[in-house]
Amino acid sequence: MAQNIHDHRILILDFGSQYTQLIARRVREIGVYCEIKAFDITDDELNEFNPKGIILAGGPESVTQLGGPRAPEGLFDRGIPVLGICYGMQTMAEQLGGRVASSEKREFGYAQVKVRAKGPLLADITDHLTPAGDSLLDVWMSHGDKVVAMPEGFELLASTESAPIAAMQDLSRNLYGVQFHPEVTHTLQGKRILEHFVLTISGCEALWTPAKIVDDAVRQIREQVGSDKVLLGLSGGVDSSVTAALLHKAIGDQLTCVFVDNGLLRLHEGDQVMDMFASNMGVKVIRVDAEDLFLSKLKGVNDPEQKRKIIGNTFIDVFDDEAANIKDVNWLAQGTIYPDVIESAASKTGKAHVIKSHHNVGGLPETMKMKLVEPLRELFKDEVRKIGLELGLPYDMVYRHPFPGPGLGVRILGEVKKEYADILRRADAIFLEELHRADLYHKTSQAFAVFLPVKSVGVVGDARRYEYVIAIRAVETVDFMTARWARLPYELLETVSNRIINEISGVSRVTYDISSKPPATIEWE
């Protein structure tokens, strides 16, 4: 029998760092399953999870303050290898009898650490050598406190000028701490450091691969739903598309997809979804044309948050009505992914702050007495894409730019009208077509057009035109937490502008959005 791909696993304890999910993604990239849990995990939860290694992530608090988060009591006495990163190293030091103090000189950004001792964590890793032959590593720091005295049993592993104890180790107990962040790309050898901890020190095998993930998911789906029928709301987005392909591989005709065309999709998107899933893959897809219903509900509504809620609730109503017509369905499938699970858990602690409400089915309506199947709930977005390719979905579908759940409803500023949606659909298609032609689509992280409900004077021939304005936006980002506007060639922008104005009746002006995030968000609403 094949080995369970979850058998070799790493536990990441979250102390509130913005980088915690990045650590998990790096561990998964190494080929090892991991999960993020809150720092105050119980003994029973720890025993049940049974990790081969534990990583203590960073956090915004100070170890020097009373009442700050700490690792669970007895964690370091379990005989399980532990790696503390930044705050994780500091709380390890403090809890084991060392000392942490505020730095006179804070370290934020690039630093060079000198390796001071031999050990498996930094073995054979170097970026530069000193004249004396000592190893130097280029790393990324982000800390205001520092360890000033190591606990008993630890030795100095690395140092910088402003952090004399930049890394430490207790080889007898397999405890390691690094003040820098190996999970970020600025730490050049960060992936190798994490590999050493995960594979060498913790003894994990790299079982977490796309092919094995698909096989495991198919097995789990079959075990979970048996011979029951499953219903999925198919949007055409990456998550729902991969969910559909995975379910279809697992249970075939037991799956029925409902595709709600709300009139707020991209140009020809509805037909493309039907061609891909119904025609090419043989998936049962029911297409519901609900454009008139959505537009009538949105009439006169200007507030973006209200628009999001109306679109989300109307989707549930339409989906609910359609589901009622399908007999003997026991399961509802959703494309929930791991960051959704983490954020949902964070919101229950009361520490999350909603900037925009995120559109999803968002749970089962009371009237739908179905059980939930979420085959992607363990996966990060980059893993979902790899699974999509493994399942045979086209590259352009799997790696298409993000599209908001409410669709063009939040790319039309103010009230949504059919006229506006038709104009925007065509403008957006022209922009993306030209990006593809210039081989720049996959070099930008997200690109789209926005409809501005203001009119501007233009001139065509001898005639004045008083027509609408289209804004185009393209950004580059690693994590969508921050983003810079894409420096697209002027010639490309000129072509896009000329085509939109000449080919679309009703547009007299095109602008390019050069706002970065922060302070602006990527989407306009």
UniProtKB/Swiss-Prot annotation:
GO terms for molecular function: ATP binding; GMP synthase activity. GO terms for cellular component: cytosol. Keywords: ATP-binding, Glutamine amidotransferase, GMP biosynthesis, Ligase, Nucleotide-binding, Purine biosynthesis. The active site is at 86 (nucleophile), 181, 183. Catalyzes the synthesis of GMP from XMP. Coiled coil: none annotated. This is GMP synthase [glutamine-hydrolyzing]. It catalyses: XMP + L-glutamine + ATP + H2O = GMP + L-glutamate + AMP + diphosphate + 2 H(+). InterPro entries: Class_I_gatase-like, GATASE, GMP_synth_C, GMP_synth_GATase, GMP_synthase, GMPS_ATP_PPase_dom, NAD/GMP_synthase, Rossmann-like_a/b/a_fold. NCBIfam families: guaA_Cterm, guaA_Nterm, PRK00074.1. Residues 208-400 form the GMPS ATP-PPase domain. Residues 9-207 form the Glutamine amidotransferase type-1 domain.
